[in-house]
Amino acid sequence: MGDTTVPSKEKQTNWKIAVLFFFLGWIFIYADRMILNPVQTLIRSEFALTNAEVGLISSIFFFTYTFLQVPSGILGDKFGKAKVIAFGFAVFGLFTGLTGIAGTFGILLMARAMMGIGQGFYYGPQYGLSSELIPTKYRTLGSAIINSGQAFGITLGLVASSYIAFDLEGGWRMPFYVFAIPTVLIGLGILLFVKEPKHDNTTMSEAEKPKFMDLLKNRNLVLTYLLVFCSLYGFFVMCTWLPVYLEEVRGIARSDTGFISSLVAWTSIPAALLYGYISDKIGKRRPVILCLLPLAACSIMLLLMTESKTLMITALVCYGFFGKLATDPLAIALIADNTPRNQLSTAFGIFNFVGMSSAIVAPYATGLLRDLTGSWNSGFYVSVGLLLLGIVTVLCIKEKKQVS
């Protein structure tokens, strides 16, 4: 869909600077999320929680995060994306630090809920702004670079949390204190150094102006929304429960679970860049996604079926190479390819709202299935089934070759 607005002549940020700051933003978005996971057993012990209640800590975060997606996208389009992003960073940076002082399970849930609200202001405005600034011929590659910050953040959060809590004997609270201040500073940097282009809608008639419901009537957008739900479900099963799975099922030492879990993130970085380059080169996203989803499902099955530690690690590496983090830039490009520029923030808000709905369900459902069945495998099998559904969804997308 073409651009329906007129950019002003005001000087805008070089797209490479924007990519750098948004990359850093994702590092701390995910680091602040992931510092919880290696210390879940300590929290479970201190507050005498069930596995379902531990899963609720993540689910409440993602509930408020998901609730903010569409409103934050609309606010970004209306008042300025960089301003909305900076406000969100201030909120979730503050409550990252306050999570560490929680004295009861209820206060811990409240702090995580506020972290979710703060982080909820990032996704739609960020990808809306980056999609405006990055040239079409670099759109998937640029998104892949930005998105790779998620992998760095996952690694940083998992490894640093394990190291601070267990190796340095800082306990589960200290990692939250450590990450709070740099989080706020990144938001300030985005506000100061990333300037967005201005658009003039005054020359358009009311009939010509795009409407919110147009985004829900677009076939390709709706199918991409469903795709991201299927992809993210398995990813958040991995993010939330993989360290516990490695410790309880595989007998991995607590101090090592963070590093092994981070292999998923590390291998996704070169993969996402490679797929982004290929997609931009051929001008299509759909064929690449169709290759990746079956391989991601097979990776999870290998993780569950093998008794070998070597093959287990191989399965995690393969999931990183073919899974959510590797396919995300392709789905992001699909959204940008099918959305008017002055609705990008809103479109990405809907996209992430649908995707993150899976993150509300996955942590709690997987913990509940473990409590009911006595096995962690049941939750992972659900992830595989949704990936297969995602393949069917992508087959229904109609895509034209993108021209630079």
Question: Can you name each region flagged by the protein language model?
Answer:
Residues L36-N37, R219-L273, I332:
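Extracytoplasmic gate region of multi-pass secondary transporters
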Residues A111-F152:
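Cytoplasmic helix-loop-helix junction between adjacent transmembrane helices
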Residues D3-Q12, P197-T224:
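Juxtamembrane intracellular "pre-TM" segments in multi-pass secondary transporters
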Residues I146-L192:
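Helix-loop-helix hairpin linking two adjacent transmembrane segments in secondary transporters
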Residues K78-F89, K281-L293:
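Cytoplasmic membrane-interface "Motif A"-like loop-to-helix N-cap segments
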Residues R285-L334:
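C-terminal transmembrane helical hairpin of 12-TM major facilitator-type secondary transporters
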Residues F67-G106:
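Conserved MFS/SLC helix-loop-helix module at the cytosolic interface between two early adjacent transmembrane helices
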Residues A48, G80, I101-I107, E169, ...:
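Helix-breaking motifs and short loop linkers at transmembrane-helix boundaries and internal kinks
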